[in-house]
Swiss-Prot record:
Keyword Protein biosynthesis: no
Organism of derivation: Salmonella newport (strain SL254)
A cellular component term, taken from the record's GO annotations: cytosol
Name of this chain's protein: Bifunctional purine biosynthesis protein PurH
Pathway the protein takes part in: Purine metabolism; IMP biosynthesis via de novo pathway; 5-formamido-1-(5-phospho-D-ribosyl)imidazole-4-carboxamide from 5-amino-1-(5-phospho-D-ribosyl)imidazole-4-carboxamide (10-formyl THF route): step 1/1; Purine metabolism; IMP biosynthesis via de novo pathway; IMP from 5-formamido-1-(5-phospho-D-ribosyl)imidazole-4-carboxamide: step 1/1
Swiss-Prot/TrEMBL keywords: Hydrolase, Multifunctional enzyme, Purine biosynthesis, Transferase
SUPFAM superfamilies attached to this UniProt entry: Cytidine deaminase-like, Methylglyoxal synthase-like
Catalytic activity field: (6R)-10-formyltetrahydrofolate + 5-amino-1-(5-phospho-beta-D-ribosyl)imidazole-4-carboxamide = 5-formamido-1-(5-phospho-D-ribosyl)imidazole-4-carboxamide + (6S)-5,6,7,8-tetrahydrofolate; IMP + H2O = 5-formamido-1-(5-phospho-D-ribosyl)imidazole-4-carboxamide
Record's keyword annotation contains Transferase: yes
InterPro entries: AICAR_Tfase_dup_dom_sf, Cytidine_deaminase-like, MGS-like_dom, MGS-like_dom_sf, PurH-like
Domain commentary: The IMP cyclohydrolase activity resides in the N-terminal region.
Protein family per UniProt: Belongs to the PurH family.
Amino acid sequence: MQQRRPVRRALLSVSDKAGIIEFAQALSARGVELLSTGGTARLLAEKGLPVTEVSDYTGFPEMMDGRVKTLHPKVHGGILGRRGQDDAIMEQHHIAPIDMVVVNLYPFAETVAREGCSLEDAVENIDIGGPTMVRSAAKNHKDVAIVVKSSDYDAIIKEMDANEGSLTLDTRFDLAIKAFEHTAAYDSMIANYFGSMVPAYHGESKEAAGRFPRTLNLNFIKKQDMRYGENSHQQAAFYIEENVKEASVATATQVQGKALSYNNIADTDAALECVKEFNEPACVIVKHANPCGVAVSTSILDAYDRAYKTDPTSAFGGIIAFNRELDAETAQAIISRQFVEVIIAPSASGEALKITAAKQNVRVLTCGQWAQRVPGLDFKRVNGGLLVQDRDLGMVSEAELRVVSKRQPTEQELRDALFCWKVAKFVKSNAIVYAKENMTIGIGAGQMSRVYSAKIAGIKAADEGLEVKGSAMASDAFFPFRDGIDAAAAVGVSCVIQPGGSIRDDEVIAAADEHGIAMIFTDMRHFRH
């Protein structure tokens, strides 16, 4: 597919002007005639470029406040005309062939994201002429190049220089695919926006209608292919959202190591999202999507050392996340002590990278700092459908806690309770976390009964010789029976934090009082499946 087409005439009409002046200058310098509209034409003319206004070319003025600019046969005939087949009819109607269309669309997403955006503002930022030209050019990619991304400008000029002012059919086809992806994403944004405004008389509650559109259109971009998926017999790829505003595994830069696997990405996401909950220097070690060790301290080195002590066996081959820069001392401690799949941190010092480079299989990712958590949607695929919910960004403050036991928690117990409550949010349900002095000492994850998660947490602490007496215990959901409290008391837990809300809360609280345990209700559940 190397059939070349020379670029002699280009139509430029862009909302995002980034790079357009330089691109237009490069085209003009190579003898390309420039057509343009409105603000783009004025900008190019101000820079001294020879440009013809589309209204001058068509003989028909822009009208209706710019709503009608390019919807004209001389424009679309020039784009859609098939070279060698429609030449006669084009000549008869004085339609000049347009070999390249450079268009990006009205900023609909940015407009509706603004606080106080009215429906009228949204409507006026629905591009009509732009998508029409994009689709026309993409349809006729055999003869026309359609450019919708400024990131392609340099490559296009380089190819034209290499091919005497022409572009290959391979390139035009690739540009056409990008164009259809672009218009599909654009229309999806509009459909989602209006779909979320469906009123109650269509069957939804006002609350649901304002949050979830009746038809959900999703657009993700493939970042990489995988060797395989969760298991070796499954094929897989990693897709990411455009314009992600929060530091994440999707936006992270891999600075060292071999390609990330499917499971690497899933576990790195779990580790990073957990470590984001802490303001103090923190370390989270994850294995199979569950934290197996978490700690906060005055330095990430000490946080790592304490997190590792929770469960050294499970930490082998795990994922390690930090909320501070990876320094040389911490990197050396990790490399000397254990096998690690991935380390992710906001940044990594040059000295740290020299140390981790000694282990070629260690993947190091930097994700940048995060100023705040960004609300969004979580998805869970079920056979034949998709469950959609808000991200679980909820977290209680100390002021919102309710002490329901006779005994009040000590200051240290309260600190430990809040710490392990944050960790429990990221442990698979049923989740039980034991913590003492800002480090986990036992984690029970994913059990079908809550009491067994509590028992497992105690067993893990005992296996590592960690002192449970005087520790805090967090449960991601309420205790349906007192047996979980009895199990915790048997190993020395002195404070329990849980949502509350069971019909047997009175029995559970009574059990805490019998054992002299301080019990705190959060009134917020954190199931994780």
